[in-house]
Amino acid sequence: TTYRKYPVHFLAFDHKVKDATFSICPQKEGRLWIGTASLMPDDHIDGFRADVLALLRGLKAPVYRWPGGNFVSGYDWHDGIGERDKRPPRRNPAWTGVESNDVGIHEFMRLCELLDTEPYIAVNAGLGGVKEAADEVEYCNGAEDTPMGKWRKQNGQAKPWKVKWWSVGNEMFGDWQLGFMSTEAFVKKHNSFADAMWKV
């Protein structure tokens, strides 16, 4: 089965309705396989709501961190790369629900550009490994001829972003965190991550 994208524009007649239902119904007998349905307002900016961007601009925050909180300890950054419609949805291991992976590195970097703010990226030091972290740095900051830089270019971004702010993990001292470990163990893990990331 080959999935296809079908963009549709429609107008909601009554904007005051609180409990509306959106349905996709075939006109003939048969079977529909729907990967996902995404609804965005017409005035969205690269997938972000214009009103939310306006509010964020008003904050004038100098730095934005992503991915945030406990979520990062189970997040695989590879899942947020490539065409949005082909990204795998994943069960969110830190919280309930499903992560659609609509926002990955490229979208986060675009958000920072739109807000004129510095990106700050957290790497997965919970269930993630050293190589994944170093590869993520290379994907963001590596030259076009590096393995990750080539992949970044294939995904539409030739020039490296030169991300300056990075962190290793999130609250690894807490037993609520995926991959929780003792302070002594995390110091060793942190340093091995940092060494590999600095070498990129």
Question: Where are these predicted regions, by residue range?
Answer:
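Non-catalytic accessory regions flanking glycosidase/transglycosidase catalytic cores in CAZymes
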Residues: 1-200
